[in-house]
């Protein structure tokens, strides 16, 4: 699977480990930065670029990482067509995909040990959208609103 990833300085070290982990698992990972550690960098450009790539490449998924994951999720959700979910447990990671068809996952590097973060990302990537009518209806309502305010 093609996976787009973006982070700032707070998630840089974890991102490097996530990229290696995913490539070892056979995923095609596109790293949208940060490419070097810079304590003064800003997360929006990296996260927006990764999120836009997910929209531009249907079937791909995205990962954004920061200190808490909150701002990174918000930045990714600025991109039309993105449904980014901040996850903190196996259940939230799986439900983001199963019920909400989330296409970007946000993880807080300062909130989880490396093993926990990798498990959250794996759970997100391996869980398909259920396709249940009620979940699709809710997603369609969000898409309709998104289109109406951007028109």
Predicted regions and their residues:
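C-terminal binding/interaction regions
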Residues: 2-6, 10-11, 90-151
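A general structural signal for well-ordered alpha-helical segments in protein cores
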Residues: 15, 47, 72, 117-118, ...
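Glycine-rich phosphate/diphosphate-binding loop of Rossmann-like nucleotide-binding domains
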Residues: 5-24
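Short helix-loop-beta junction
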Residues: 20-29, 81
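N-terminal entry motif of extracellular EGF-like repeats
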Residues: 42
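A short beta-strand-loop structural module common to alpha/beta enzyme folds
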Residues: 28-39
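Helix-adjacent hinge/juxtasegments
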Residues: 46-87
